[in-house]
Amino acid sequence: MANERPAQQSDIKLLISKGLEQGYLTYAEVNDHLPDDLVDPEQIEDIISMINGMGIDVHEVAPDAETLLLNDGNTGNREVDDTAAEEAAAALTALDTEGGRTTDPVRMYMREMGTVELLTREGEIAIAKRIEEGLSQVQAALGTFPLSTELLLSDYEAHKEGKKRLAEIVVGFNDLIEEADAAAAALAAAGPVAVDEDAVDEDADEDGDDDAAEEEAGPTGPDPVEVATRMENLANEYAKFKKAYVKYGAEHKNVAKAREDMAAIFTTLKLPLPLTDALVTQLRGVVNGIKDHERKVLHLATTVARMPRKDFIRSWEGNQTNLEWVEDALKRKQKWSSALRDVKDQIVSEQQGSIEMEKANYLTLAEIKDISRAMAYGEAKARKAKKEMVEANLRLVISIAKKYTNRGLQFLDLIQEGNIGLMKAVDKFEYRRGYKFSTYATWWIRQAITRSIADQARTIRIPVHMIETINKLNRISRQMLQQFGREATPEELAKEMDMPEDKIRKVMKIAKEPISMETPIGDDEDSHLGDFIEDTNVESPIDNTTNINLSETVRDVLAGLTPREAKVLRMRFGIDMNTDHTLEEVGKQFDVTRERIRQIEAKALRKLRHPSRSEQLRSFLDID
């Protein structure tokens, strides 16, 4: 890379020198001198602008001599400044290096995103069909797995008991969809239908978005009666399969036929994605259980008993549930036979576990693995197609995320949330409705971004429903401000929003953003907001000084009394003590009665009320 840069700079210098000499360059000449990995249109536009700024015009084709003469009259006589050309070449090379070889993740993301071509409507439909084919293969594999049928029937029973919605179990019928597709294909093959142009609404939406919206708004979901009929048929076929399994065993042809009949009905039902995921997880759990037993046997035979791995694999294949396998291996009388005999019971126990799994799933281990492989193939096919659809629409996320900047989340976070919404849109896209994917995905992307802003943008999280109320309140407040020329009162807002006034005040209080105590204040920004907020937990300097002066003055005044009178007052009012005392407590201290203490206190207070003493304390009185 270091050796390439001087060569590029030299090429660009020659290009600029040529442009200065002849007064123009063609786009082809510029493109020939740019690196192959520079594909960002904005970077190329910046380079063209920099060349134009040097007084070099860039044309599609070379202009004729007459045009050049009319434009300037100095063509061919411009002074070539080598230093300027070198500086410009270095700048352009740096620009190119920044665009083509950057390590900035944002630029790398943008560049890689730009290499993926946009999809046409036909391309979107082709990918959507591949996704559908992959999911159909997954469902076809699940249909041959009896426990999938059992779980589906169990969920339908929960629906009949009112515990689940029908949409959580069945969303349509695959065979009816295929029939509709075949009819549409036959209609298309028949050729275009003559249309009366006068009867066509000129304002009709070309993309069919309004029709799609109306279709979505109408009644959706499968016919409950039809679902009930098919579920009943599926339950009957499942019962026949179990009966045949009990009678003939897993490998009998009658059992295979019953399983095919059951799968044929299962695959006609279009299942929602959450239920499909649950069925896939169930099958994976069974396969993982089988592999767990096999891993334990492998460990016992090869690690503990020291049986060669190749010998184990060769003899174990097809004997996973053969309880005589260990005995057959011992008959070979190898050097590891003694150690294998020691772990025989453990191996047989694991084989018994595999046999129990066969019985529980009504299939042989080989059949379960075949179903798992078919399911994995369909998943991989659908996942690859979904990846293509997502990558082709990443630009859409960028364009939508730009509208939500400066709302509390960084731009990259907005893109990430938008991409999550895009993936959900890919999962739920139905190409048969006729609208483009971008039309459908925009709503999902926007919802994902706005939801993330509501959840994450604020320092103190506010629930989404409250965010919606706050946004509505702000919108109505702006409208009333424009209408009346002043801020609306809570009473007016409550009337306009048809909400209680106390709730309006609560929403207005919640809507306030927290502010940092370190917020700079003033032009110099040398002080912070926290410096101007009063700390009510700390005594103010004025009050502190006043209390000190009051204490000193009280001591001086008490010094003018007899020691006995001063002590009585100190104890009665708690002066310079932890607490005050009752007449009885003071009397015990002086060994006199309560009445005598009351008389001493009254006499001392009369002395303090004398103007010569009271004047010193009067200034401390609150005359507010």
Curated annotation (Swiss-Prot):
Which parts of this chain are annotated as the region Sigma-70 factor domain-3? 468-544
Q: Where is the composition biased (Acidic residues)?
A: 197-217
Give the start-end ranges of region Sigma-70 factor domain-2: 389-459
| InterPro entries assigned | RNA_pol_sigma-70_dom (IPR014284), RNA_pol_sigma70 (IPR000943), RNA_pol_sigma70_r1_2 (IPR009042), RNA_pol_sigma70_r2 (IPR007627), RNA_pol_sigma70_r3 (IPR007624), RNA_pol_sigma70_r4 (IPR007630), RNA_pol_sigma_70_non-ess (IPR007631), RNA_pol_sigma_70_r1_1 (IPR007127)
Q: Which GO terms describe its cellular component?
A: cytoplasm
Interaction with polymerase core subunit RpoC: where is this motif? 413-416
Q: What's the protein name? A: RNA polymerase sigma factor RpoD
| Organism annotation | Xanthomonas campestris pv. campestris (strain ATCC 33913 / DSM 3586 / NCPPB 528 / LMG 568 / P 25)
